[in-house]
């Protein structure tokens, strides 16, 4: 074990070490996990008092493990002779709004270039397919954090995003082969077998899928607006089809070097293979550390948690055009909150029925006004159109025609 604070080696002061990292919402791909590291030090002489939170901590668990870098983002409430510090890797800093200044449409490569300049982190492009980098993007939401954007991009080629080195992040695709083999499980709960046979994306009126339902379905995050082409779903399926492992809980084992969520581990010469979605490493001295693993993935079509930043002014833009047989959908939505300027429009025609949706904002008291909050509701009205395309000027009713 090697631990350095700046250039100061504090390894001999270590009393307790706990590293934890997990995937959100039990999802297999599209994750941007941040490693949380909690360490307790002997601070008898106050050498760690008033730490500089701008400095990186360098951690290397053993000679065979990668060197990882962490920062303390908040000063301890108080400094004591036994000092506990909580720190995170660079992915933690990605929870900031993607305040893009690009003129849309752009490509994903353009967005990654801008994210590099906004975060100061280098995005390693090795392994990102060219069709992903070249994909055109015509939408943005500047209240959604950069971490979500990177996760959505990673999902396009069955990858996750990890911090690497002192100032980089890397996209790492899921592999169907085991990352490591071990015989050192001291406890485990083995559950059902997961076999991927289908990939499915909701995508509004036009669901996209590849494969069949003989096994398990990988559901693409329904909030991922990048995942809008059949070719993307085909590519994810081709990469992951046949992926098989046992879901597990409460695995206790001797730690495996450089293991992170997203990897497969083979136990006892192919007795079974399990997926790592949640990992905790504890070290209290001695020759090795111990790990606790959970390996569950979702089998339901559930929305991924989207983290937003609350700004005084929010700007959202969305443009969607879709044509599926007789269905025609054109959506143009813009909204600015905090400056009293709003616009929303939705037009849908299917044969002779048109749907008009208008947005109504109601102020709910002085407290809400001060918080610049609002309550929104949608009123749906129907009318018969003579040509099935042009919405009529009159005859609108909240009752659907029979």
Model-derived regions: residue spans:
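Acidic, low-complexity/disordered segments
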Residues: 1-7, 79-87, 101, 170-224, ...
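Assembly/oligomerization scaffold segments
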Residues: 1-102, 140, 152-158, 165, ...
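A broad structural signal for short, well-ordered beta-strand segments within beta-sheet-rich domains
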Residues: 11-23, 132-140, 185-189, 276, ...
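Short amphipathic alpha-helical segments
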Residues: 13, 107, 111, 145, ...
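Alpha-helix C-terminal capping segments
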Residues: 59-61, 115-116, 262-269
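Charged- and aromatic-enriched interaction segments used to assemble
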Residues: 76-194, 217, 226
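C-terminal, beta-rich DNA-binding module of retroviral/retroelements integrases
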Residues: 224-248
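Surface-exposed receptor/substrate recognition regions of extracellular proteins
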Residues: 272-275, 323-402
């Amino acid at each position: 074990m090697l631990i350095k604070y700046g250039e100061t080696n504090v390894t001999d002061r270590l009393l307790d070490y706990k590293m934890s990292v997990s995937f959100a919402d039990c999802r297999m791909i599209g994750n941007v996990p941040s490693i949380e590291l909690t360490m307790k030090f002997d601070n008898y002489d106050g050498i760690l008092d008033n730490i500089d939170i701008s400095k990186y901590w360098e951690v290397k668990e053993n000679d065979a493990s990668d060197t990882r870098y962490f920062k303390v983002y908040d000063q301890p409430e108080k400094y004591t002779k036994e000092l506990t510090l909580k720190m995170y890797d660079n992915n933690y800093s990605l929870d900031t709004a993607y305040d893009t200044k690009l003129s849309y449409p752009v490509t994903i490569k353009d967005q990654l270039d801008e994210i590099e300049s906004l975060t100061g982190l280098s995005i390693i492009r090795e392994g990102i397919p060219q069709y992903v980098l070249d994909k055109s993007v015509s939408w943005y939401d500047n209240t959604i954090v950069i971490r979500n954007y990177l996760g959505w991009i990673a999902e396009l080629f069955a990858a996750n995003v990890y911090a690497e080195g002192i100032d980089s992040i890397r996209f790492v695709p899921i592999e169907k082969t085991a990352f490591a083999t071990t015989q050192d499980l001291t406890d485990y709960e083995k559950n059902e077998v997961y076999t991927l046979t289908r990939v499915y994306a909701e995508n509004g009126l036009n669901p996209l899928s590849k494969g069949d339902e003989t096994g398990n379905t990988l559901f693409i995050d329904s909030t991922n607006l990048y995942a809008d082409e059949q070719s993307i779903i085909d590519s994810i399926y081709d990469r992951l089809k046949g992926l098989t492992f046992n879901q597990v809980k409460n695995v206790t084992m001797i730690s495996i070097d450089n293991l992170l969520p997203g990897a497969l581990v083979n136990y006892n010469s192919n007795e079974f293979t399990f997926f790592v979605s949640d990992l905790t490493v504890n070290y209290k001295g001695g020759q090795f550390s111990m790990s606790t693993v959970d390996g569950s993935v979702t089998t339901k079509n559930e929305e991924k948690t989207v983290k937003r930043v609350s700004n005084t002014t929010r700007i959202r833009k969305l443009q969607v055009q879709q044509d599926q047989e007789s269905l025609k959908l054109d959506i143009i939505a813009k909204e600015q909150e905090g400056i009293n300027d709003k616009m929303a429009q939705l037009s849908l025609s299917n044969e002779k029925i048109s749907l008009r949706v208008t947005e109504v904002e109601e102020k709910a008291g002085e407290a809400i006004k001060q918080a610049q909050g609002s309550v929104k509701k949608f009123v749906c009205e129907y009318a018969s159109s003579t040509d099935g395309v042009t919405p009529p000027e009159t005859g609108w009713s909240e009752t659907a025609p029979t």
